[in-house]
Regions:
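Transmembrane alpha-helical segments of multi-pass membrane proteins
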Residues: 75-91, 144-155, 204-218
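Hydrophobic cores of alpha-helical transmembrane segments in multi-pass inner/ER membrane proteins
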Residues: 48-61, 115-133, 180-192, 245-265
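N-terminal membrane topogenic signal
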Residues: 2-17, 141-145, 267-268
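Membrane-interface helix-boundary motifs at transmembrane edges
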Residues: 4-8, 65-75, 134-143, 194-204
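Transmembrane alpha-helix entry/boundary detector in multi-pass membrane proteins
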Residues: 11, 31-52, 110-117, 165-183
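Short, membrane-exposed interhelical loops at transmembrane-helix boundaries
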Residues: 104-108, 229-245
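Juxtamembrane "helix-exit" motif on the non-cytosolic side of transmembrane helices
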Residues: 27-35, 62-65, 94-105, 159-168, ...
Length: 273
């Protein structure tokens, strides 16, 4: 079957999106787990997996070209990477919760423990890689699944924004912007999934995603300024123990993924009445 160019480019964009995110996660995890100097051996697992997953996905992309589902080697390699990523994410979630929350199920332990939802980034990326190999990009279901994964990411981002900023009691009013932004994204994307044939709504959601990306960049700059001006003997200490420098960029990241799904739904044929 000949796949239209716009769908081939969408599948390729998701492949490169996933590979870039795995590479980025390696840096983010190294910084996060350096806080306790990788006290537990299993903290090295997501770091090592991220380093390996990025080139493996690129190799899969080179083997499969614009159709990772169509080439046997690319499909097998991608399925293995995707399944492993899901396992790493779920096990990381359980380990993060086990650090305090499973001992005493309190809101304080949920807020001040390791970020419980952070490992689910692996699960989301793994599911995205699996999607590219199990569903043809030309099918409307592909765009809906991509949008659903973006929605799930924003739900997790909402929880992370609440928990992270609750640690300092929302000291600055601007910290509420992240919570409101994530909540708006959840509302709009959930509506888009149920009213996916409404082209005007889908285009409005694209505008909302542009705002979400701006929120992410603004948050990154605010975290950067806070770390540069914050206490700490060295610049490394300020970034290590200060505001998580890369966390706000999750808004921009998810906005890109959601936009890919939204554009796929806009380009899909209108359902027959």
């Amino acid at each position: 079957m000949r796949v239209p160019a716009r769908y081939r480019s969408a599948a390729a964009a998701v492949e490169l999106f996933a590979a870039a995110n795995f590479a980025f996660l390696a840096l983010d995890i190294f910084l996060a787990h350096s806080v306790n100097e990788f006290a537990r051996w299993e903290e090295w697992i997501p770091f090592g997996f991220s380093i390996a997953a990025a080139p493996l996905l690129l190799a899969s992309f080179l083997a499969g070209g614009f159709r990772p589902r169509g080439a046997r080697a690319a499909r097998a390699l991608g399925l293995a990477v995707g399944a492993a990523a899901v396992a790493v994410g779920v096990s990381g979630l359980l380990l993060h919760l086990d650090s305090a929350f499973f001992e005493r199920q309190t809101l304080a332990n949920l807020v001040y423990t390791a970020p419980f939802a952070a490992p689910l980034a692996f699960t989301g990326l793994g599911l995205l890689v699996l999607l590219d190999r199990l569903v043809e990009a030309a099918e409307p279901e592909w765009a809906r699944w991509a949008l659903l994964l973006a929605l799930g990411g924003f739900v997790g981002n909402l929880g992370l924004s609440l928990a992270d900023h609750a640690q300092n009691g929302f000291f600055r009013k601007t910290e509420w912007i992240a919570v409101a932004g994530a909540a708006f994204a959840v509302g709009f994307l959930a509506t888009a999934l149920f009213a996916r044939s409404d082209r005007r709504l889908l285009r409005a959601c694209l505008g909302v995603m542009a705002i979400e990306a701006a929120v992410g960049v603004a948050g990154f700059l605010l975290h950067l300024r806070g770390n540069l001006e914050g206490p700490g003997r060295t610049l490394w200490d300020r970034f290590l123990y200060g505001a998580p420098i890369f966390a706000p960029l999750l808004f921009a990241n998810l906005a890109i993924l959601a936009s890919i799904g939204l554009r796929g739904l806009i380009a899909a044929p209108a359902p027959e009445s």
